[in-house]
């Protein structure tokens, strides 16, 4: 069974590099929040009621982070860049599945 802790472990390195997204533990559960540094305000807030929802929100945040990192927001991604980022996303998903297998053993 996937846990929030396992998801946070898998995404820990990414979260330490991305200063725009944070994971906050609220009284209702985890929430992923995206900061807009130009407007100086939160621009996305996604409540994650399950570990799977947390994983999916972090996959989306990671994709945005990598797209900005690669293009600097100045151009569209090339097909090769899209493919590379998709492979990186798939690797995160695979790591989460491995965490499930480890916890289930």
Q: Predicted regions: what is each one?
A:
Residues 2, 39-54:
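A short, exposed loop/beta-hairpin motif centered on an aromatic-Gly-Thr core
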Residues 1-20, 58-85, 92-105:
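Negatively charged, low-complexity tracts enriched in Asp/Glu with abundant Ser/Thr
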Residues 37-45, 85-95:
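Short, charged low-complexity intrinsically disordered segments located at boundaries
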Residues 15-43, 61:
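Short aromatic-glycine-(Arg/Gly/Cys) micro-motifs in beta-strand/loop hairpins
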């Amino acid at each position: 069974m996937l846990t929030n802790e396992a998801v946070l472990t898998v995404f820990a390195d990414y979260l330490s590099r991305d200063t725009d997204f944070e994971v906050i533990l609220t009284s209702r559960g985890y929430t992923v929040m995206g900061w807009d540094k130009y407007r100086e305000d939160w621009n996305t807030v996604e409540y994650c009621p399950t570990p799977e929802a947390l994983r999916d929100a972090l996959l989306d945040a990671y994709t945005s982070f990598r797209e900005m990192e690669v293009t600097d927001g100045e151009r569209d991604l090339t097909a090769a860049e899209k493919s590379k980022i998709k492979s990186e996303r798939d690797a995160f998903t695979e790591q989460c599945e491995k965490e499930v297998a480890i916890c289930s053993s």
